[in-house]
Amino acid sequence: MATLLVLHGPNLNLLGTREPGVYGAVTLAQINQDLEQRARAAGHHLLHLQSNAEYELIERIHAARSEGVDFILINPAAFTHTSVALRDALLAVSIPFIEVHLSNVHKREPFRHHSYFSDVAVGVICGLGASGYRLALEAALEQLAAS
């Protein structure tokens, strides 16, 4: 049994009501519930945290190593384009991760095109809405099965 951690960055607590044309109508609670059910059905344990505070996400990443987390799914949200600290935390713990974005960041404002995570992630999924989380989970489980 593997343990997976899903991290949601700033403003994702507003999913379902925040710019539904961009981010969809699915709530964060619905995304988390779906991922928990899928992980459990596959015989794994899934944890999740949403925070608007960079330091809380960093602290959670640090704790993940001592807790034996095997894989991380992260939607850094706006921190994607700004946070060297989150990138460094992920590199420091050496836990593989997949970067997830609800919207296609490459079809949006130019400042959203750069990610501090993509080049060190196992993979990146963007533009598929809430389904992107499901696909990231499936990919993570495949990666874990192959290792």
Swiss-Prot record:
Catalytic center residues: 23 (proton acceptor), 101 (proton donor)
Gene Ontology molecular function: any one: 3-dehydroquinate dehydratase activity
Catalytic activity: 3-dehydroquinate = 3-dehydroshikimate + H2O
Disulfide feature: none
Keywords: Amino-acid biosynthesis, Aromatic amino acid biosynthesis, Lyase
Binding site for substrate: 75, 81, 88, 102-103, 112
Gene3D superfamilies reported in the protein's UniProt record: Dehydroquinase, class II (3.40.50.9100)
Keyword flag Lyase: yes
GO aspect biological process, one term: chorismate biosynthetic process
Matching Pfam families: DHquinase_II
Residues carrying the site annotation Transition state stabilizer: 18
Functional pathway: Metabolic intermediate biosynthesis; chorismate biosynthesis; chorismate from D-erythrose 4-phosphate and phosphoenolpyruvate: step 3/7
CDD domains: DHQase_II (cd00466)
Similarity section: Belongs to the type-II 3-dehydroquinase family.
NCBIfam families linked to this entry: aroQ, PRK05395.1-1, PRK05395.1-2, PRK05395.1-3, PRK05395.1-4
Assembly and interaction partners: Homododecamer.
The protein, known as: 3-dehydroquinate dehydratase
Gene transcribed to yield this protein: aroQ
